[in-house]
Amino acid sequence: MWATYVFIAVSLACANGYSSGAPESVCQDMVPKHPVPPQSTPPPYTITTSTKTVKAGTPMEVVITGKKPTDKMRGLLLQAREGTKIVGKFTLAPNDPFAQLLNCGEPGNAITHKKHDEKNDKQTVAFTWTPPKDFVGEIKFRATIALNGAVFWVGVESGPVKVIS
């Protein structure tokens, strides 16, 4: 009987996760505080970019796609990184039903999901990212993507993007 209660409590916690988005406390390690570990299998998501080279201060698009129609996203934390340093800013479409900006040390330098109904889970999401005007270097987009509260992948990365002056 006791095991049943524990199972139900853990299941509810997994299902709920951070339904209103990732908290700032996970900005560095990007690991959700769900009561289950991340998946160790390859992620069923890809992160692609509109360009492999971008001029500093010039916006570009980043797209996250589930490989199959069933590979939808319930949760997301996305950043652009040069090594461990979070770089640049994101912009969102007005009234985006899925995503919101998160401040990981700087305003708008990360994106997370917002509370939404399951019908608004997404197979594909696209965002605009702009590198700082004074930044030159190489970044990768890095994400934590949750299929649901109990199934998520940490460290999903894009290929490198060069930022030039």
From Swiss-Prot:
It is found in: Secreted. Residues 1-17 form the signal peptide. Transmembrane segments: none annotated. PROSITE patterns: REELIN. It comes from the Eukaryota. Its main location: secreted. Disulfide bonds join 27-104. Keywords: Antibiotic, Antimicrobial, Disulfide bond, Immunity, Innate immunity, Secreted, Signal. GO terms for cellular component: extracellular region; membrane. One of its GO terms (biological process) is defense response to protozoan. InterPro entries: Ferric-chelate_Red/DefProt (IPR051237), Reeler_dom (IPR002861), Reeler_sf (IPR042307). Pfam families: Reeler (PF02014). As this protein is expressed upon bacterial infection, it may have antimicrobial activity. This is Putative defense protein Hdd11.
